[in-house]
Structures are given as structure tokens and as C-alpha cells.
Amino acid sequence: MITLMSENTEISTNCNHNKVGFLGLLITLGIVFGDIGTSPLYVMKAILHTGETIDESTILGALSCIIWTLTLQTTIKYVCVALRADNNGEGGILALYALLRRLKSKWVYILAIIGASTLLADGIITPAITVTTAIEGLESISPNLPVIPITLAIITIIFFVQRFGTESIGKSFGVFMLLWFLLLGMVGIISITYYPLILKAFNPYYAVILLAKSPQWFLILGAVFLCTTGAEALYSDLGHCGRKNITISWAFVKTMLILNYLGQGAWVLTHAQTASSVNPFFSIMPQSMLFFAIIMATGAAIVASQALISGTFSILSEAMNLHFWPRMRIKHPTYVKGQIYIPTINLAMYIGVVLIILLFRDSSHMEAAYGLAITITMLMTTLLLGIYLHTKGVSRFIMILFIGAYCTIEGVFLAANLSKFLAGGWCTMLIGCILFLTMYVWVCAIKIRRHYISAKPLDDYYQIISDIKADGSIPKYASNLVYINHANKEGAVDDKLLYSIINKQPKRADHYWLINMEFVDTPDTLEYDCETLIPNTLYNVTMHIGFRIEPRVSLYLRQVVEDLVASKKVDLTSAYPSLRKNGIPGDFRFIIIHRVYYPENSVNRQQNLLMNLYSLISKIGIDDPKALGLDTSMVVVERVPLIINHRINNIRRITKIAEEQPNRQL
């Protein structure tokens, strides 16, 4: 097994983000905690808008719910448990699925695509609600300020700069978020001094009493849940920052968040008459700091939006390699490892965020749409984590206890958030359903296509391939002929590949290369095996590609060839005398076998529907040569029919052959 260098691994990194230290902790603040760090902008405001009476028991109960939600959900489930379920250092629901894929259970991939779909769907709301809430703070200074146009302008800039990368400004995100969290804690402490009894909220008794007695407890829980919506990002960003950096940073972040929530609660109890008509986050700010706080809130919202957009690109890149999503054009706008840009997704997200802003108009209405989808993501993560714990030898009792406890907690939150369905939750659920349908159809169609690929033993054709190479009467097609072999069995070859070489048009070449691409369960694996099947004629190359690595077959094959030439295992100098005497290497040509589905051939209506939807969905992706990273000037695409349980229509003869009618006059 020999290691390859990908385009990604060649990109330099200036520091090791996973190394524990001040720099690593600072970078972690900028990458991981943007979403959860901006939740104080809208959580308390959402609680006050539930219609519950504003008194000490309500506020203490709501704050107690926030504190213990952050503890049970974020600290225990994600920081203490999920961060340990890493896939070679990578985290997130798709990385977790890759660990469990070998179980070959249908439900494992169903849970994964449900979780990924709802995570992506809720991501449309985050930039909209965070930026809108931050800009709404300006209304306390100038009530007639046009919030929506300013918000749309900021959102437009955020998405526009994605094509250029964020390397230059990204370095300052950590410093900015450090200042942001210090601001949260400082103003929280100042406000707490005016009502110290607010510290009683640490007692879970007040949460229990509120949930037991309040008629609005469902609505309050739906608002409380917004404080932990960013918890999934902690797990997804594990590979960027490392478990220790996230764990240590979270201790600081959680402290600052709780201080700010307590400060807002203290302000509400001392201004109960007017609290419901303003945003407590901005109200606890000293008047002299208000404009500065609005600027900081806007900056934090931009950081949160940037982190979410980058996270969306990463999730969909993983989904492409796991065959959950059609392959799209991916760009690398900077020299930072792992920073990618997907133009189609960037445009789709921008349109989605703009529509959300125009549809809901203000953050109070957006709160109703926020949280429902991410609750489902958390439930899916809980179930997958439970399965993972079982595969690691954790006792069945502990596994059932973990799944039972968190399914109960998240089930209650889900029920609470369902109360917001008609008020706006339908929006993210609709987006999530569209994404789920896309992923489900893609997975099923890929399985159908693979099932109907016919494979033949390759060694049965060694002789005829050698004969074609030696047959001078056949025009030479290329010096080096490269095929992508889709047969999954060892020692087998796609029969359409053989048909292309032998039957369709005999293709004579000096060297034949069969490329097998195996997408493995580890994130950054990039290795190959090469087997010489016919000396100096036929080679079988298997590339093992991690689910975070972008396929670049031309680049990787060049490295394989260079290795073989350097070790004198193959001579690729052109066979043409005029080129050979000058040491010119032979040319390469790639043949892509593209199977075209013809629906009239299928007798299975379900398969017919899936394949028709697959054909429709594939239009948003790129073609096979681009998806494989091939130089399109050297590629020939041969289209063949994909036969699926085709109908057999017997043709009936209506005329007799001449021998049967000797006396017929023509």
C-alpha cells in the first residue's frame, strides 16, 4: 500500500489547530462556537414572547432550563461523549456514519441522511436570524432604521466573499470571538449585581416547577432549546480543532454564556413591565456601550454565518464521497487545508437565506422556524452514538440508558418545537424533506446501478487483450488506455469495459490501466495498490480514498505512473520511433463508461420512479469526467444502456422467408 499526495494534502497549513495551546484555543473559539455563541441574542427574547407571565418563578425556571440544557445536551452528550466518537480525528454525523457503515444496516444510513438533511436545513435559518437580530439592535438607537435592507446587504457580502476564501479575515475570528465572549460575561456580571437572587437558577428545582405548573411550558421549552442549537457544530468541527481544544474552550464559553443569560434574567426581573417589548440582550448593555455592542453582535453573527457556510460545504463534500449527494464542482479558494467552496451550494444557500429574511421579516418570526429541524438531527446523532457505543463493547445497559435518556430529553424538545410548526417550523421541515428525498433517491439509485453491473473474470481475457495489443492491423487507439472499473468483486471487470476494448471498436494500446476507486470509512486516507496483470501491458490500480478527500484521478494516476517508472516496473516511453528516440512518453486517454437508464425497459414501478428522479437530480451535479477530476481533453465517454429487469417483447414474423415461398413473384 503506497500513499498518494492529494491536492488537499499539498496545501500548506501554517499551524496545527489540534495542538493544545493558546493559539489552538483561540482558533477553536473562532471556528466552533459562532452559532452557540450568538444564541444570547435571541433566546431570552423568545422566552418572553411565549406569553407566560413575567415573574420570578418563570424567569428562574426558564434560566434553570437553559443552564441544565447546556449541561445535559452540550456538555455531557456532545463534549463528554460525542467528541470521543471520532473517525480518525474527524467528527460529525456523516463521520459517525462512516464508522458504522460496515454494519451494512439500512437503518444506519437512513438515520445518517435524516440527520444530515435536517442539519443542513436548519443551517439556512442561522445566518438569517443571527444577522437580523444583531441589526435590530440599531432600532434602540434609531427606531426608523431599515433593518431588512441592511441585513440583506450584509448577507450578500458574506456569501459573495466565499469565492475568494476567508483565510485573511479568518485568522482574526478567534480574537474577535474571545472579545465577544468576554463582553457577554462582563455585562452579565454587571447586571447580576442588581438582582443577585438570580443565581438561584442553578437549582434544577425551578426548572421542574416551571415545567410542571406553567400552561406555556411547551412554548418555553421550544425557546429554551435555541440555546443549544449550536451543539452539533462542536461535534462537526472536531477535525478542525481537536477534542482537547474544544473541551477546554467550552468551559470558558459555557461560563460566559450562563453569566449573560443570568444577567438578562436579572434585568427582566427588575424591568418586568417593559421587558417583553425589547430585546434583553441589548437592554443590559450600558448606554455608552450600546453601539459598540451592536457592532460586536453583528461581527459575531458574521462569524457564526461564516462557520455555518463552511460547515455546509464540508458536510456536502463528505456526502458526495459517501454517495449521498451528486458530485458538484468544488473549488479551493485559498491555500488553507480543507477550505473549500461549492459555487452551486453557495448560491442555493444565499437564495434560501434571502427568502427566509423576506418571508419572516423580523427575528421574532424567525425564532418560530428555528430549532425544529436541528432537534431531529440531535435525535439521529443520539441513535447513531448508541449504536457506536455498542460496537465499542459498552454494556447493553449503558447503551440503552444513554439512548433512553437522550431520546426522552430530545423527544420532549421535539414535541415542544412541533408547536412552532405552523408558525414557521414548516419552512425548515420542507427544506429538510427536499434534502432527505434527494439523498435517499441518490443512495437507492446508486445501489440499483451497482446491482445491475455485470462483472466477468478478468483473467479469462488476458490472452485476447495481449492479442489486440500485438495486432498491427488494428489502428492504435492510444499509447495508454485508462478505464474506471466499477466491478466490486476482486479479480472481476465490468463487462461493458471488456465490450469497449474488444467488441465495440477494438482498441489497441501499448498499456491498459484499470482504475478501481474504493471510498473508505476513514477521512483522510489516500493510498493505492498496483498489480501487474500482464507484464508491460495490463495494470490494475486500486485507489483507497477517504471520505473527506476529493477524487482527482488524473493527479493520482500521474503519481502512480511516476512511482512505477522510477522503480523500472513499466516503460512508458512512446512506441513511435520518432518520439521514442527523444524519450517522449506515450499519450494517455481515458474511457468513461456511462450507463444510460431507459425507463421503458423496467417492469418495476418503484425502481422506475427512483431512476427517473435520479436522472432529474443528477442534472444539478457535474458529469463523470469532471467528477473524477479528469482532463476532459483526454476523455472519451461511451454511453451504454442500463438494463433493469427489462420487458421481453417477442417480435412476430409477418412474412415468410424466400425459401418457404419459392414461387413468389418479386
Residue map of PLM features:
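The structured alpha-helical core of multi-pass membrane proteins
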Residues: 2-666
